[in-house]
Amino acid sequence: MSMLPTFGFTQEQVACVCEVLQQGGNIERLGRFLWSLPACEHLHKNESVLKAKAVVAFHRGNFRELYKILESHQFSPHNHAKLQQLWLKAHYIEAEKLRGRPLGAVGKYRVRRKFPLPRSIWDGEETSYCFKEKSRSVLREWYAHNPYPSPREKRELAEATGLTTTQVSNWFKNRRQRDRAAEAKERENSENSNSSSHNPLASSLNGSGKSVLGSSEDEKTPSGTPDHSSSSPALLLSPPPPPGLPSLHSLGHPPGPSAVPVPVPGGGGADPLQHHHSLQDSILNPMSANLVDLGS
């Protein structure tokens, strides 16, 4: 263990100081310590020093320097998780500044696709939502047997997957929510399908496109054609008024020339106009006699 020239610490001691200051969150003090290190190439290639430089660059917003450090040196797997977080968070922050709004899940996914992790801090295994496929496989296998793991089981799963207990809990909660939503959607579609198959009226309406209660356009009276059925047939087919009382229709609305004459049985081929006048006389004469009686 040799002392560094013109410096009071060994390389191992420098690495230890960097780790302690990082874990304690003393980023400003860590930055000053790194600045005080001598210009020794061997020292500055130490992995703990490089990781400390990356942390300081991130907190100072010097993302270009951060990317340069992460891409230029091969880091040990036990440091990958920490450095991957720095890489992704830095790109998220830059994207949010560029767009002027916070990123959602889709936006973060697009950033990850656009700026994949460098192989210097990534073992090449595909990740999903920052979970390795091996971890997801373990969680899926456990979920198939028990969707509600106990706190002790969650701790065991966290150790087996390299995740935190909170990450394991959130994964199971999100998976249960997705499954419940899928089941509700499938149940709704099944109910709609059953209701349509058991309703013949709805099926006939959907098939023919016409209402069962509606009539066709050909059965309706054409516009502009006079409707004789509302006047003279109603008058002619109504029962005659009792003796001594005038007809209500004859007082207010005497039949006009549009009235349709009704053939008199046994009349043969009588003139319709002559029959029309005789019909008027048969209605008006009793009324006139009644008026004379009332006047006397």
Swiss-Prot record:
Protein name (database record): Homeobox protein SIX2
GO molecular-function terms, A-Z: DNA-binding transcription activator activity, RNA polymerase II-specific; DNA-binding transcription factor activity; protein-containing complex binding; RNA polymerase II cis-regulatory region sequence-specific DNA binding; sequence-specific DNA binding; transcription factor binding
SMART domains linked: HOX
Signal peptide location: none
Keywords of this entry: Developmental protein, DNA-binding, Homeobox, Nucleus
Subunit structure: Interacts with TCF7L2; in a canonical Wnt signaling independent manner; prevents transcription of differentiation genes in cap mesenchyme. Interacts with OSR1; form a strong repressor complex with TCF7L2, TLE2 and TLE3 to prevent the activation of Wnt/beta-catenin target genes in the cap mesenchyme. Interacts with HOXA11, EYA1 and EYA3.
Region of interest (Disordered), residue spans: 168-284
Biological processes, Gene Ontology terms: anterior/posterior axis specification; cell migration; cell population proliferation; chondrocyte differentiation; condensed mesenchymal cell proliferation; embryonic cranial skeleton morphogenesis; embryonic digestive tract morphogenesis; embryonic skeletal system morphogenesis
